[in-house]
Amino acid sequence: MFTARKASVEDCGLIREMACVAFPDTYKTILSPEQLDYMMERLYSPENLRRQLAEGHVYYIAYKDGTPCGYLSVQPEADDLYILQKIYILPRFQGVHAGSFLFRKAIEHIKQLHPAPCRMELHVNRHNKAVKFYERMGMRKLREGDFEIGGGFYMNDYIMGLEI
């Protein structure tokens, strides 16, 4: 059985611990080791996680039978637009519907904040197998782009969206 709870600053260590497994596993065949290191520091250093929470990112941690199995982050972008910043599942929990559980949790969170119709968007690397997952969850490709992230690196992403 899956459960989820909203994360607090005290959970930054747990989020980072899961990210150190899930993020490299997701991108090991897509990004260079140098870009992986750069992005891990940029996204998951303790100070950057605390900053994200202070800026309004809301993290949820998912559990399967009491064991942490993944996390998500949602951020309001505009009155009727929310960004699914992150959704990652530890490799050993992939294929057991943890991702769809967290995806639905993101929608539930947004609907609590914004009962009127709105849109959820996300960026996903064009070569990430998660593109198919997001399509199965009802998202569609809105546009694509190559976004400079510093350090000479780019994110080569689809921007996908879902009306909720």
Where are these regions (language model features)?
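Acetyl-CoA-dependent GNAT
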Residues: 6-12, 17-92, 103-113, 141-147, ...
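Conserved glycine-rich acetyl-CoA-binding loop
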Residues: 67, 90-104, 117, 125-132, ...
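Extreme N-terminal starter segment of soluble prokaryotic enzymes
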Residues: 1-3
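C-terminal "cap" of GNAT-fold acetyltransferases
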Residues: 116-131, 135-164
